[in-house]
Regions:
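A mid-sequence, solvent-exposed acidic-amphipathic segment
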Residues: 186-235
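Transmembrane beta-barrel domains of Gram-negative outer membranes and organellar outer membranes
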Residues: 19-151, 156-163, 167-174, 180-187, ...
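Sec-dependent N-terminal signal peptides
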Residues: 4-13
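Sec/Tat signal peptide C-region and signal peptidase I cleavage site
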Residues: 14-18
Length: 312
């Protein structure tokens, strides 16, 4: 609860700072157009630096299939993963202001921790502007809390889903997304902190990771996407899981963004089995080298929920 209050306070302070800087802006200064560094709210596994304007809401569906190849893939094992469902997420994200977004979602989850409910805030503190050297990049802060509503296993088993109480069912992510568009190419760097309230003995409650993402248009409506995360783990934690025959791999995704009239469709390939950062940062054990990557897609539709009267 203290962490949740800290996150809310953090966004309140940042929002107040943003309002103050707007007030003291010189009215005679030349106005520049905001640069749209990424087109969507998500790259593949990673969030993007973008936020929705005030009153705009998106409805999104993410779907991760089973392994394409490897021991659990191929024609005879689930027809290249299409017969299996690793994870599904359905969510909404709405612009409360032109900088602050609120999101809520439900994800199936993969592995031991399932039945996940997410809420989060996304605040864009800085915006890159076209032909303005004073605003060379965009910076967004994202924070969430995820609750697992699944039935807990026996606490004597000491598994990661052997929840002891309501508080132990939660995990939180705080992420800073920094991005810049160079001509047609968009690059993003996103360091991340993950805290999991309950972990099995030998695992780490606190993890740091760093991610990166790229976007490169191949045509007006067909775009190449890729993202990658590396999680920093202690050697003792690595040795603990290795003794149980578990090895971790960095999540990597590559895919295509297809922009259609009214919808944005992503066709992706990734070794991550979970959709939420709270899970794939901690527990990606699938390897591209062993064929343990999967088809995935994201479908997004934007709606106007309310209009900003000041913008008229």
């Amino acid at each position: 609860m203290k962490r949740l209050l800290f996150v809310v306070l953090l966004f309140t302070v940042i929002n107040s700072f943003g309002q103050e800087t707007t007030i003291i802006k010189t009215p005679t200064k030349q106005e520049f157009t905001n640069t749209k560094v990424f087109y969507s709210q998500k790259v593949i596994n990673s969030k993007s630096v973008e936020v929705h304007p005030k009153g705009i809401m998106d409805f999104s569906i993410d779907h991760y299939f089973g392994d394409i190849a490897g021991d659990n893939g191929g024609v005879r094992h689930g027809f290249f993963g299409l017969d299996a469902i690793k994870d599904v997420r359905i969510g909404f994200q709405i612009g409360l202001t032109d900088r602050l977004n609120f999101l809520i979602a439900r994800a199936k989850g993969s592995g031991f921790v399932t039945n996940q409910y997410e809420w989060g805030l996304k605040y864009q503190a800085l915006r890159q502007k076209d032909n303005d050297p004073g605003h060379p990049l965009s910076l967004t802060i994202f924070a969430n809390d995820v609750l697992s509503a699944m039935k807990a296993t026996d606490t004597a088993l000491h598994l990661e889903n052997s929840f002891e109480d309501f508080g132990s069912r939660h995990s939180q992510v705080v992420q800073v997304l920094v991005a810049r568009k160079f001509g047609k190419l968009s690059l993003q760097l996103n360091p991340l902190y993950l805290h999991t309230n309950y972990v099995e003995p030998g695992a780490e409650e606190d993890l740091f990771a760093v991610g990166g993402a790229i976007r490169l248009p191949l045509s007006k409506k067909f775009v190449l996407l890729a993202d990658y995360f590396h999680t920093f783990r202690s050697q003792s934690s690595i040795d603990f899981f290795a003794s149980k025959g578990i090895g971790f791999h960095d999540p990597f995704g590559i895919g295509f963004e297809i922009i259609t009239e009214g919808h944005v469709f992503h066709l992706n390939f990734t070794n991550a089995t979970d959709i939420l950062e709270n899970r794939f940062i901690r527990g990606t054990t699938s390897s591209w080298g062993d064929g343990e990557f999967r088809w995935a897609f994201t479908l997004t539709r934007n709606f106007v929920v309310f209009r900003d009267k000041k913008a008229k």
